[in-house]
Regions:
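Intrinsically disordered, low-complexity terminal regions
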Residues: 1-8
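A short glycine-rich, His/Asp/Glu-containing loop-to-beta-strand
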Residues: 8-41, 48, 131-165
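Fe(II)/2-oxoglutarate oxygenase catalytic core
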Residues: 14, 21-26, 40-42, 49, ...
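Beta-strand residues in well-ordered beta-sheet regions across diverse protein folds
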Residues: 43, 53, 61, 95, ...
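Glycine- and acidic-residue-biased ligand/ion/polar-headgroup-sensing regions
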Residues: 45-67, 160-163
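Ligand-binding loop in jelly-roll beta-barrel domains
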Residues: 74-114
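Double-stranded beta-helix
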Residues: 100-140
Length: 165
């Protein structure tokens, strides 16, 4: 297959929204593309963070534990995401384990420290909304009541040919 458009993304952060720039009170967001073996180190300080696997596989080593995806999805259209929640006062290094790794993550100030959690796709609650050609699948990666200060993360999948408002 010949691609008409090719991604210009090399590696690094390709999307960034800070609470200051957006005029928000809490949430910061970035999306990052990495090549195999690349490392990203981050210190949450007084923030909690949710890392969502968009495509590929990663390994995380931290002062709170270690986690690894081995069967990550190919892209956002091929299954439910792996999600890693890390509390405040966590120092971690994430390493790309696949040829290409695409992740998104949001972080915000946290009032309390919670336990880290690694959520596998098969343990992610999914809910179907709508009907007929307006059906959507909501993947509750970090639903309300999850056991964190402020972060909530939901992935919405609209099947081909359907529409969503």
């Amino acid at each position: 297959m010949k691609l008409l458009l090719r991604s210009k993304i090399k590696t690094g952060v390709y999307q960034q929204i800070t609470s200051e720039k957006a005029g928000w009170n809490w949430l910061n967001f970035e999306a990052r593309f990495m090549k195999k073996g690349e490392k990203w180190t981050f210190e949450t300080e007084q923030h909690e963070i949710a890392i969502v696997l968009l495509g590929g596989n990663f390994k995380v080593e931290s002062n709170k534990g270690a986690w690894e995806t081995k069967n990550g999805r190919k892209n956002v259209f091929s299954g439910v995401a792996h999600t890693l929640y890390l509390p405040r006062e966590t120092v971690f290094t994430l390493t790309a384990q696949s040829e290409n790794l695409d992740i998104a993550y949001g972080w915000c100030l946290a009032e309390k420290t919670f336990d880290p959690k690694f959520i596998l796709p098969e343990n992610t609650p999914t809910v179907i909304f709508g009907g007929d050609n307006a059906t959507r699948q909501f993947n509750d990666l970090i639903p309300p009541g999850f056991g964190c200060s402020r972060i909530v993360s939901r992935e919405v999948y609209t099947p081909s040919g359907n529409w969503s408002s």
